[in-house]
Regions:
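Aromatic- and glycine-rich beta-strand/loop motifs that create alpha-glucan
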Residues: 1-24, 261-275
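Secretory targeting signals
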Residues: 20-51, 55-101, 121-191
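Short helix-to-coil transition segments within interhelical loops
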Residues: 110-118
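Hydrophobic alpha-helical transmembrane segments
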Residues: 4, 17-21, 162-167, 192-196, ...
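Membrane-helix interface/capping residues of multi-pass secondary transporters
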Residues: 15, 117, 189-190
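An acidic-aromatic pocket/loop used at catalytic or ligand-binding sites
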Residues: 104
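Terminal transmembrane helical anchor/hairpin motif
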Residues: 34-45, 61-71, 194-275
Length: 275
């Protein structure tokens, strides 16, 4: 069995991962993006009597939501904004927990000469990222079906949720995972989640539209497609920077594990050296 698969299964069985996924689904539900709480309609349009709330857009904004976003894109953008904000905090917890448990039960895996530090850390990083992306993929698939039922399959972009999950949310997961992983690898202490929680606390006062944000871009509106199109370049640069920074932090974590393997890294813990 490959190291990636072993790490992936270990992550999926961990209590911290199960708790993070549960919290993610609950946040998505209470943030009204899983499932969506409103259907997009044009100003002056007849309201369907099916009990679903409506989001009335001005004629120009509705035309963009219909022709550019094809409805599902507008919902997917709000989904990515709110779920991405939650994952910026939650993804750090399983990463920190895994290295925290290594202090007791998996020290042999860290010190084993048969597996390089770089392979171990990057396989673990990939497994953590894939595991946190899994519930997002399931929700994206479910919401694509919901959009097709609400607007008709011919009227929606069937790939919209997948594109936003891949290009908007995945870099957030990658960066937050690295933030959880690096302090735990350096010190053996779960400091990464504290940093993520601090960011989450400060993000409460962030502007509703922040496309260049490194951790989690924001687009807190169902619609506003023109604003999004004007800032898509800033969004792309921020997403690339987040992914590259996540990889850089992961490389630093691998260096820290290698340092410990050679008997020098324990000086990082309160000045003590390995015996």
């Amino acid at each position: 069995m490959s190291l990636f698969r072993l790490e992936f299964l270990r992550v999926c069985r961990s209590a911290s991962y199960i708790a993070a996924v549960t919290a993610l689904v609950l946040i998505a539900y209470f943030q009204n993006v899983f499932p969506p709480s409103a259907r997009i309609v044009a100003a002056g349009a007849e309201i369907a009597a099916d009990g679903l709330e409506t989001c009335v857009l001005a004629a120009g904004d509705y035309a963009l939501a219909r022709d550019v976003d094809r409805f599902s894109g507008a919902h997917a953008r709000l989904f990515a904004s709110r779920v991405g904000g939650a994952l910026a905090v939650l993804s750090a917890f399983p990463a920190a927990a895994l290295f925290w448990h290594d202090r007791r039960g998996c020290r042999a895996a860290v010190c084993a000469r048969s597996v390089s530090s770089w392979k171990l850390v990057f396989c673990r990083y990939a497994a953590l990222t894939a595991a946190m992306a899994l519930p997002v993929a399931v929700m994206a698939l479910t919401l694509t079906c919901v959009a097709a039922m609400d607007y008709g399959p011919a009227n929606v972009d069937m790939l919209a949720y997948g594109k936003y999950a891949l290009f908007w949310i995945l870099p957030t997961i990658a960066l937050s995972t690295a933030v959880g992983l690096l302090p735990a690898a350096l010190t053996g202490l779960p400091l990464g989640p504290l940093l993520a929680l601090l960011w989450g606390w400060r993000a409460r006062s962030a502007p509703a539209f922040a496309y260049a944000a490194l951790f989690a871009p924001r687009h807190e509106a169902l619609g506003e497609t023109a604003r999004f199109l004007e800032n898509v370049g800033a969004l792309a640069r921020g997403r690339v920077a987040a992914a590259l920074l996540g990889l850089a932090l992961c490389a630093l974590a691998a260096f820290a594990v290698e340092w410990k393997r050679r008997g020098r890294g324990y000086a990082l813990r309160f000045g003590r050296r390995a015996a």
